[in-house]
Amino acid sequence: MIRQCWAGLRLCRALYQTSYRWHGKSACERALRYSPGESIHGFTVNEVTPVPELFLTAVKLSHDNTGAKYLHVAREDSNNLFSVQFRTTPLDSTGVPHILEHTVLCGSQKYPCRDPFFKMLNRSLSTFMNAFTASDYTMYPFSTQNAKDFQNLLSVYLDAVFFPCLRELDFWQEGWRLEHENPEDPNSPLIFKGIVFNEMKGAFTDNEKVFSQHLQNKLLPDHTYSVVSGGEPLNIPDLTWEQLKEFHATHYHPSNARFFTYGNLPLEMHLKQIHEDALSKFGRIDPKTSVPPQERWQSPREYSISCGVDSFASDPEKQTMVSVNFLLSEITDSFEAFTLSLLSSLMVDGPNSPFYKALIEANLGTDFSPDTGFNNYTRETYFSIGLQGINKEDSEKVKHIINRTINEIAEQGIEPERIEALLHKLEIQMKHQSTSFGLTLASYIASCWNHEGDPVDLLKIGDKISRFRQCLKENPKFLQDKVKQYFQVNQHRMMLSMSPDEQHYDKEEQLEEEKLTQKVKALSEEERKQIYEKGLELISLQSKPQDFSCLPALKVSDIEPQIPLTDLEIAYAGDVPVQYCTQPTNGMVYFRAVSSLNTLPEELKPYVPLFCSVITKLGCGVYNYREQAQQMELTTGGMSVCPHIISDDSSLDTYEQGILFSSLCLDRNMPDMMHLWSEIFNSPHFDDEERLRVLVRMSAQEMSNGIPDSGHVYASIRASRTLTPTGELQELFSGMDQVKMIKRIAEMPDMGSILRKLSRIRKYVLLSDNMRCSINAAPQQMETASKEMEHFLTGITRSKKERKAIRPHVVEKSSNPSPSGSEISRTATRKLVGDPTFKPCQMKTHFCLSFPVNYIGECVRTVPYTHPDYASLRILARIMTAKFLHGEIREKGGAYGGGAKLSFDGIFGFYSYRDPNSLSTLSTFQKATDWAKSGQFSQQDVDEAKLSVFSAVDSPIAPSDKGMNHFLHGISDEMKQRHREELFAVTHSDLTNASNKYLTAGQCTRGTAILGPENKNIAKDPSWIIR
């Protein structure tokens, strides 16, 4: 998986995923007992550092024989994480680190079976497993809550990275190969195939990724950042198997490795296994992988590039992107990087920032350019600022505005209130608790540590905030001086512009064809024969049953039979039910509310997503939109609104439709947060056309940019559109219909009619009628929270007259959050809408897009959550993915991904992602059904599928999200326990019966959708709708 920016999460984003409350001190106490100089299983302790603000203790070590670096973060968190990363610094764009990342996971000395990595997804209870290729490092992380599982996964990961098989056929499959279009027909044409090859062809259909890649290549042109680490599709076929093996030998050595462990498991256990299984077998080398500093320019530079046309652009004439980019400080200077990240946020984040005012509100473009802000995932950090969605002729104007704004910031500085708001945001982010803190931590420190920076110093956020405040106190122009140093006088700046070319993809295709012709012409007859024979050998290998008995595995008996219960209390504030969930929230309060859409006229429904996206951004009460944003930043951790469409747990034709309001704050700020919600509910502003225009254009741009990354999601939403009433609403609210509607609105010259529609929606949903709320907070906060909820709910508007539901069939459903037999004062009632006349129908849709790969979704209507067969279908989806679809779609077909899944609303879906095939993949979906019906899987396969499903069922839940299954879905602990028992009870025959009953062609109604290039066969088939 190529992830160039994943490792460089900006500071604010990374910190947002912090910290579990310190329930106990055992893990940290154990870590504090270590002493610098102490030897443990071949490692020497270098440093032990408590970081109380994050409730952790950091232990830094080094391996005696190899020099491998090691950081252990002890914390009372059961979701333990391991990661090993290597500094990988390619000097060409063949994608060697990316293809190597894939290929090492295809078998190793201890585990020589094919694809042990994917097989372990079904033999463990992991909460995360993946691998990432960044610009200058490759990382292999996993996490799990089970100690035995941790040891199993660690064994597989260590053997994979240090002792991989690196077989030639695996290189062919994962990287690239020349192969006959039909491998069994030597007369069919030779073409390029390969998983990474197709993945990167798909990646480069994303114009934002293209822009970001060129930005880095051109701003840092002297070394590894000048190439595409993931692989340029036209360069990938230049990589040889021998070069791959050589790259592994020089880069995947312990002397070039950094190990990271996190959680409450004993450090000694990790060190012993890592030393004995891997590091003891190596000596020390000089890996020579360091990245030299970029030579600084004496004058600015400018570049122009081209890209494909965006068919969803709100204005076809405005598709140019332009940015000005500045090379900044070394990433290893952690306080300077911290300061520059804060300065960046102050310059670009939110409607009160200088660049937002100067660029976004200048009516020149639709949104900031890709990578806008502070970027800290290369040896030297950089800042980027610009616009997308502009006229090509306006590029110089944008450059002038940027220079002018920099001068204004240097002259006028930043308002103190905005600095306080940003520091308040940091305080919230340090208190907010995440279930994946270990993973976030690993990614946060990765880039700095990769270049010999101090990862422990990065964790001392409290110290940096104190030092930052002191710098401002001693020098009120501290930030202005930074602006002058890094932006006004910095000559290492680069302007990059990118404009669409209608022939772009045709030219790419022509270049690929020329590359292919060149390769084919150079082949001898013997080489052609070998290609045909190797193609047959690869198919044979991919089709041959594998023996995975060498791989470690948990057993179903290792799964906890009972779920932990969550205590919930339902109380009423007036007529509104409020769910209270007492949790150790570390000084935070979490608020949610659901307001019904049952009385909203049908003609207003398409505008609900737009209403949700803008209602907290238009101003309210005494605040204009800038003042509202400032108050939100000063008193909350964010306020969000989104559509809420949930199928009933017992009927696919019954559902809840509403709007979900969410926010969080420090406990001391709850009165201010609820006051803001009161102002939004009682006095929202719908009178600023220009503000709405800005927000709509940004939304349209964001949706358009998201299609290449989420094409399979859009295809699946479309495919399920005609299968259930909720499917129809999902397409309306979050599918391609919504994308096209927002595009149309963004093109409108007059926003008055839209504002009037939004104002009408407000009259139906910003009311206390048909509302329910929830609060998650610490025990000592509940009394205050209850009073604030009472004050809020009695202060917002109620309907002056009772409104009837637009759809006549309303079902009132009470939900009891506690197990039967327990006492509870009251229950909450949800008003669901039933559609007893709904008839599912088949529909096939092809969205013709200028992509070289396909995104495919095929869906089948099955049963709701509480149906006895739901558990069988859930297991079935997993077993079909792991035992059939993965091999057919990814290994044989060359798609980046594919599989089957069962949604909560009873839709059984097949999908593929960045797929070079289309109709043949649909045939594979049918073959998967035939395979499942015939029962060609073992009891071991069933048990593995159960493990995989339970890893999702039992994934950690943060205190902020406890009780949300009940509040949002009406699912009680008792219902979850019943479903759990049904999962345990699923048998081999249950799976074949479910396949026959629900997936058999002719007995089920299917919906199908493809997003991808034109297809002659589909165009000739009248059963397809072409869009």
From Swiss-Prot:
GO molecular function, one term: metal ion binding
List of catalytic residues: E101
Cofactor details (free text): Binds 1 zinc ion per subunit.
Pfam family, one: M16C_assoc
One cellular component term from this protein's GO annotations in UniProt: mitochondrial matrix
Transit peptide, start-end: 1-22
Superkingdom as given in the UniProt entry: Eukaryota
Compartments (UniProt record): Mitochondrion matrix
Positions of Zn(2+) binding: H98, H102, E199
Region Disordered, residue ranges: 803-827
InterPro entries listed in its UniProt record: Metalloenz_LuxS/M16, Pept_M16_N, Peptidase_M16_C, Peptidase_M16C_assoc, PreP_C
Enzyme class: hydrolase
Entry EC number(s): 3.4.24.-
Biased composition (Low complexity): 814-825
Protein family (similarity comment): Belongs to the peptidase M16 family. PreP subfamily.
Subunit structure: Monomer and homodimer; homodimerization is induced by binding of the substrate.
The protein's role, per its UniProt record: Metalloendopeptidase of the mitochondrial matrix that functions in peptide cleavage and degradation rather than in protein processing. Has an ATP-independent activity. Specifically cleaves peptides in the range of 5 to 65 residues. Shows a preference for cleavage after small polar residues and before basic residues, but without any positional preference. Degrades the transit peptides of mitochondrial proteins after their cleavage. Also degrades other unstructured peptides.
Protein name: Presequence protease, mitochondrial
